[in-house]
Amino acid sequence: MTNSNHKAESISPAGYEQNLACIFCDALISDRSRIVQENELAYATRDAFPVTPLHTLIIPKRHVIDYFGLTTDEVVAMHELTLAQKIIIDALDSTVQAYNIGANCGEIAGQSVWHCHIHMIPRRAGDAPHPKGGVRHVIPWKGRV
């Protein structure tokens, strides 16, 4: 489900559609200090409300609502940043042993920021009492272990 109130409102100097009210579009314009890595089509930033230390968001530069609106080139660019950030995070914190990677697409799935972003959540031994099943437990009583 997309919301028509979240249409692109401007074109940035780089030519990317951006929504001036969007926090992720704003990071490209006025808060670049939060960007830890970028390529032509996407950027990485540490989550402002991290689930675990070094929780990272991979974000397309173009204002697009969710993963299903991405172009193939944007998917590739975001994938490249995800792989690069894994190397960086692993080097920054040797206690990281695994990752959860995912996106919320639509209000019912929990999306609350209407600009596509991929969560990259580093995991460490003992950070959750029963991690078995991972994302299968996004609906707690439905996941099988």
Annotate each PLM feature.
Residues 1-145:
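HIT superfamily nucleotide-processing domains
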